[in-house]
Amino acid sequence: MSNSEVRPPLRVALVQFKPTKAEVSANVEAIQRTIASQSSSTDLIVFPETSLSGYFLEGGVAESAVTTEELIGLMGSPPDRSPDVVIGFYERWRRRLYNSAVYLEAREGRWKARHVHRKMFLPTYGVFDEARFVEPGTDVQAFETRFGRIGMLICEDMWHSLPASILALGGAELLVVPSASLARDFSPAGGRSRNLERWEQITAGAALEHGIFVIVAQLVGSEGGKLFFGGSIAVGPDGSFLARGPLLEEAVTLASLDAGSINRSRMASPLLADLEQMLPHLQRSLESTRPHAVLEDSHAPLENEAQEVVGEGLVGEGPVPDKDLGIIHAAELNLDLDLVEKTLIEFIRDEVRRRRGFERVVVGVSGGVDSAVSLALACKALGPENVYGFRLPYRTSSQESLEHAALILDMTQAQAQTIEISDPIDLYVKEYEPEISPLRKGNLMARLRSIILFDQSAKLNALPLGTGNKSERLLGYFTWHADDSPPINPLGDLFKTQVWALAQHLGIPEVIIEKPATADLVKGVTDEDEIGVSYHAADPILFGLVSGYSVEELVRGGFKEDEVELVSKRLQATHWKRELPTVAVLSSSAIGEFYLRPVDY
């Protein structure tokens, strides 16, 4: 982007891409088609992080990693008037594995690698365990292209301020960021997940601070329920947004980068020049922060002084802020329901059709709000002709439940069927277990319903779709190997109160939403009777516990002690119900311990 007086604007294309998991050749072909379609109108095309394979490969990284030379061979010959291309991929380099991005130029009828950046900051929190499967890069450098000096970072590299500063100090006027950012935390009225809002803050801040362009190409699609959201962005050197990609869909987002705006922005806000001037002093300060420097510093606090600081609450446990945590957590449970609906519809469509290769699903319809919401979402995602709703009543099932199940089946126009489970249950009880307890009998009914759903799914070449919510899962309030058995569950990360809100948003009949929640396994018994606390009370407590608050902090923050204790005990006592069966590890290839592959591999 040098010689801005004579150079026309740089035309960039940010590709939101859904790779086929671990199918490198198929993904290269899709990349080639996209390049060919944009070759006459684009100067630079950017594909997301791990475009060759998908992001979550676990131990499969080694099987999908290629060298840069192998990638160039797979890419074949570039089209006429080819743009430059950036591709994110798992790289094999010097017998090691990296999460990398390569900048390719078309020269003399073939692709040439101008630069490779290897991701430095590898996330190892939450669902991420990247450092287990690849090694971190150790270098960040700006490089020359026919469009001027460019720098590349990958995803979390961008969340740290120093790499972008180093590239800008190295002369980069354009920062290219392939990314695979998971959607999470859907706050109301945001229109985007909270992590995408954070992306916009980071990129705008880096662009404005350094007077550079920043472009981010985001992966899109569901990988085993982990949703890449899209939302690619291009930001100008004044921090303004030049382009935004759509959410949850493949797309090519175009932006025009006028190099002249760099000079104008740096004149208006000469922050990069200030940084260059202060850099030697900052380097000396940085050197003084080395771990051993504190020990050499005569002004370092003595041990008893450090203890006094801890006592003042600057480090360690301090008083809980004077806030009502119940109000805070209840507010945190509010959702952007339009965005959640769109996300879950795309999740069902992506996981059932693209990842698993099915067209249809079966849903057990109880007449309760959870199954009503799952059924409605499935019909929106797949069409009602591809959704089979099964009523599976026992003779003591309430007439109200049957009527409500019929109501939602009629509303959604799903394919409806009723199968009575009374005879097989009663026969087993009469012949073998005449003294069976109500709890065991309820579990027996739940497991038989699951068996029937799986058998019907085999008959219909369909997948069972789950209906269990997050509150039930965290409280252990479900029948093991029954409610939790469907392979796909759109509601599993929604608290019960959030399901109620989503149900209202979807237009589920009020009579279903407002009735007391019940598993309808024991006549007249509600969820609250069995759990011992209402969902409205339990959900904010659960949110606090899984967010890292202790029982004591929640009680001091305003929650009722007996309810916090009850919810905490149920959470702690039921971890086993949320895990796969425990296997004795006897080898270095134990499945799920050493041999790791994602569910959609």
Where in the sequence are the language-model features?
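Short beta-strand scaffold segments in enzyme catalytic cores
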Residues: I87-F89, N99-L104, Q141, S232-A234, ...
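Active-site catalytic loop in hydrolytic enzyme cores
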Residues: W93-I202, A268-L271
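CN hydrolase (nitrilase-like) catalytic-core segments centered on the catalytic cysteine
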Residues: T68-I87, C155-V252
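C-terminal beta-strand edge segments of enzyme domains
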Residues: I212-P319
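N-terminal active-site segment of His-dependent metallophosphoesterases
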Residues: M1-L44, V176, T343
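ATP/NTP-dependent adenylation/nucleotidyl-transfer catalytic domains that generate, transfer
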Residues: L279-V363, V373-Y601
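Cys-nucleophile CN-hydrolase/nitrilase-fold catalytic domain and related Cys-dependent amidase chemistry
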Residues: V24, Q32-V116, S181-G205, E209-I212
